[in-house]
Amino acid sequence: EYGFTAYILGQDQEEAHKHISLFEQHLNALKHQLPQAQYYAYLSSVYTYKLGLDKKHLMKYASGIFDNIKRAMELDDEDPLVLSMQGNVEFYSPFGSKKKALEYYLKADSIYHQMPNTAELWNVRAVQMTIVQCLAKMNRAEDAKQQCMQFLEEEPDCVIFQNLLSELTNPSNN
């Protein structure tokens, strides 16, 4: 639900509202089964999605985002999911830092690569995608291309990386 909710948020606000509520219900039901750091990281994303639908409550939702990701990092700052969520907060926050975001994403990717059986985890590809996007936003297009090609070596059929590489190679076609 985490990834789909982010996707639907930009497509259909009414449907997104339903998915945010469902995501929050499921997250609360799993509170004691998930590692606590991951629970708080996901809870931070719930507030992010709510903010995406309702900017009038910026302070309330921003507080929920920052308080929960801070709690997650205090609990486990070596969990790659938590690191990637902290990276997202840095990347997307108006006062965030792309440089810090990149550091969190790279650390998460490094940890994922040390773990067994992560090749099929979509979170790994999501982190790698955001590394490329972050480098591009930092005006480091050549680094972004190199990183994208490296990720394509790991996952040659990954359409996301093929598309990103095409965008980076042919920016005038976008």
Range-by-range predicted roles:
Residues 6-18, 48-62, 92-102, 137-142:
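Short coil/turn connectors between adjacent alpha-helices in alpha-solenoid helical repeat scaffolds
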Residues 118-174:
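Terminal, low-structured helical/coil segments at or just beyond the last alpha-helical repeat
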